[in-house]
Amino acid sequence: MGNCCSHGRDSADNGDALENGASASNAANSTGPTAEASVPQSKHAPPSPPPATKQGPIGPVLGRPMEDVKASYSLGKELGRGQFGVTHLCTQKATGHQFACKTIAKRKLVNKEDIEDVRREVQIMHHLTGQPNIVELKGAYEDKHSVHLVMELCAGGELFDRIIAKGHYSERAAASLLRTIVQIVHTCHSMGVIHRDLKPENFLLLNKDENSPLKATDFGLSVFYKPGEVFKDIVGSAYYIAPEVLKRKYGPEADIWSIGVMLYILLCGVPPFWAESENGIFNAILRGHVDFSSDPWPSISPQAKDLVKKMLNSDPKQRLTAAQVLNHPWIKEDGEAPDVPLDNAVMSRLKQFKAMNNFKKVALRVIAGCLSEEEIMGLKEMFKGMDTDSSGTITLEELRQGLAKQGTRLSEYEVQQLMEAADADGNGTIDYGEFIAATMHINRLDREEHLYSAFQHFDKDNSGYITMEELEQALREFGMNDGRDIKEIISEVDGDNDGRINYDEFVAMMRKGNPDPIPKKRRELSFK
């Protein structure tokens, strides 16, 4: 979480959310990887429940039972070191897969705000895990001395190191790279997250392959936000801080400024605002003068300069949004970014949910109920943002307005279709449970204990099978018996044609159609 500036609690609203973020009541729903649930070994044996684990005392940081990360992982060499913690290579004992483990010493969390920062980082990483080009959180652990975040390993190194190694670098390559970075930020903003520390060091390559995916990392300063919410903390890294951050009145537009600074560096090799001291850098940022006359700027295209100017507009209200940057002519020159409204993450998940059968939708409702507060805090904040009258439900108009605020333009028919998809009981509104089920990321289906809980919900008599009668009863409980022949649903899932669904068939249905989980300073640059 290292940075050059102070950081802490942003607003009473965010603070309250964090205070309730990972309560002891959710202790049983630990987010750290656990012993794999026992899966039935034959189609005739009922599945066994996941083995019970002895729970430790409640940790003061994550607010749930403490666990020893070394029970599941072996820690190896040091990969990096920051203000608050150290990152080590770690190996999962059960699989041999390698990850990165960020260890935060609890003795360095000296006040309530520091603890809330760590909780929020965990909540935000859970919220964003599964999104393209964002590093995945595999589990969070707390022991007596430290908090450990086990994350996807990005073994390809820092983005700018790769660029330096390549040598020659074209505007087209810069545009392609910027497109990926802005798409990451668009995803964060559409999911109600401001990164607040965007800089080249926080973009890593997944592996050393030529076409390795780019991953955004380090969400230690990130915050949840609602449209119109104003933040006051001065956070970030000096070269990349927006002027409104220095004025203590800012929102998601500050992330666009930071990317604009990165683009300027990509194109000419030095930052736009430079001085010998941090205060000198801040004064240069507040003056806002950007040099486009020194080499190599005369040879850089007018379209590139136009985009930099619009991203480094000192007035955040006039600055481009992430969606507008993606539709800028310089970004679009190779035709890869179409001039159409972009789906935000919630929109994409609603569309995916709409295509599922009712059996799978009910199973997702059950799984949603198994998730811990820290896993769904981001979605909880998004629900509250859309539920403008605080009624506990989202109406058609609130859904339309909520998606519009996230930059999604939809026809009346499209909004109605999404409403009908999420409104499982057909009462004309979306309640909290329906919203979580429809918008949680399908990577939650990787957790064996979640799948087993859902299977047990249907298997009322614990026979190890879901019968037509049990399925019909479950659909009726959730108001989702839409008249479709239960036999038709069973036949889609019943692989061995015995007229009922066993655990393996249930798991296959839940994971069908879902993407496989992935196994898991300033630089003087000169680009021609």
UniProtKB/Swiss-Prot annotation:
<keyword id="KW-0479">Metal-binding</keyword>
<feature type="binding site">
    <location>
        <begin position="79"/>
        <end position="87"/>
    </location>
    <ligand>
        <name>ATP</name>
    </ligand>
</feature>
<keyword id="KW-0418">Kinase</keyword>
<keyword id="KW-0808">Transferase</keyword>
<feature type="binding site">
    <location>
        <position position="427"/>
    </location>
    <ligand>
        <name>Ca(2+) 2</name>
    </ligand>
</feature>
<dbReference type="InterPro" id="IPR017441">
    <property type="entry name" value="Protein_kinase_ATP_BS"/>
</dbReference>
<feature type="binding site">
    <location>
        <position position="496"/>
    </location>
    <ligand>
        <name>Ca(2+) 4</name>
    </ligand>
</feature>
<keyword id="KW-0723">Serine/threonine-protein kinase</keyword>
<keyword id="KW-0677">Repeat</keyword>
<keyword id="KW-0519">Myristate</keyword>
<dbReference type="InterPro" id="IPR011009">
    <property type="entry name" value="Kinase-like_dom_sf"/>
</dbReference>
<feature type="binding site">
    <location>
        <position position="500"/>
    </location>
    <ligand>
        <name>Ca(2+) 4</name>
    </ligand>
</feature>
<feature type="compositionally biased region" description="Low complexity">
    <location>
        <begin position="20"/>
        <end position="45"/>
    </location>
</feature>
<feature type="binding site">
    <location>
        <position position="102"/>
    </location>
    <ligand>
        <name>ATP</name>
    </ligand>
</feature>
<dbReference type="GO" id="GO:0080092">
    <property type="term" value="P:regulation of pollen tube growth"/>
</dbReference>
<dbReference type="GO" id="GO:0005737">
    <property type="term" value="C:cytoplasm"/>
</dbReference>
<feature type="domain" description="EF-hand 1">
    <location>
        <begin position="374"/>
        <end position="409"/>
    </location>
</feature>
<dbReference type="Pfam" id="PF13499">
    <property type="entry name" value="EF-hand_7"/>
</dbReference>
<protein>
    <recommendedName>
        <fullName>Calcium-dependent protein kinase 17</fullName>
        <ecNumber>2.7.11.1</ecNumber>
    </recommendedName>
</protein>
<feature type="binding site">
    <location>
        <position position="391"/>
    </location>
    <ligand>
        <name>Ca(2+) 1</name>
    </ligand>
</feature>
<feature type="binding site">
    <location>
        <position position="393"/>
    </location>
    <ligand>
        <name>Ca(2+) 1</name>
    </ligand>
</feature>
<dbReference type="GO" id="GO:0005886">
    <property type="term" value="C:plasma membrane"/>
</dbReference>
<feature type="domain" description="Protein kinase">
    <location>
        <begin position="73"/>
        <end position="331"/>
    </location>
</feature>
<feature type="binding site">
    <location>
        <position position="459"/>
    </location>
    <ligand>
        <name>Ca(2+) 3</name>
    </ligand>
</feature>
<feature type="binding site">
    <location>
        <position position="494"/>
    </location>
    <ligand>
        <name>Ca(2+) 4</name>
    </ligand>
</feature>
<dbReference type="GO" id="GO:0005524">
    <property type="term" value="F:ATP binding"/>
</dbReference>
<feature type="binding site">
    <location>
        <position position="465"/>
    </location>
    <ligand>
        <name>Ca(2+) 3</name>
    </ligand>
</feature>
<feature type="region of interest" description="Disordered">
    <location>
        <begin position="1"/>
        <end position="65"/>
    </location>
</feature>
<dbReference type="InterPro" id="IPR008271">
    <property type="entry name" value="Ser/Thr_kinase_AS"/>
</dbReference>
<feature type="domain" description="EF-hand 4">
    <location>
        <begin position="485"/>
        <end position="516"/>
    </location>
</feature>
<feature type="modified residue" description="Phosphoserine">
    <location>
        <position position="237"/>
    </location>
</feature>
<keyword id="KW-0597">Phosphoprotein</keyword>
<dbReference type="GO" id="GO:0005509">
    <property type="term" value="F:calcium ion binding"/>
</dbReference>
<feature type="binding site">
    <location>
        <position position="429"/>
    </location>
    <ligand>
        <name>Ca(2+) 2</name>
    </ligand>
</feature>
<comment type="function">
    <text>May play a role in signal transduction pathways that involve calcium as a second messenger.</text>
</comment>
<dbReference type="Pfam" id="PF00069">
    <property type="entry name" value="Pkinase"/>
</dbReference>
<keyword id="KW-0547">Nucleotide-binding</keyword>
<feature type="binding site">
    <location>
        <position position="389"/>
    </location>
    <ligand>
        <name>Ca(2+) 1</name>
    </ligand>
</feature>
<feature type="binding site">
    <location>
        <position position="425"/>
    </location>
    <ligand>
        <name>Ca(2+) 2</name>
    </ligand>
</feature>
<feature type="binding site">
    <location>
        <position position="434"/>
    </location>
    <ligand>
        <name>Ca(2+) 2</name>
    </ligand>
</feature>
<feature type="binding site">
    <location>
        <position position="423"/>
    </location>
    <ligand>
        <name>Ca(2+) 2</name>
    </ligand>
</feature>
<dbReference type="GO" id="GO:0004674">
    <property type="term" value="F:protein serine/threonine kinase activity"/>
</dbReference>
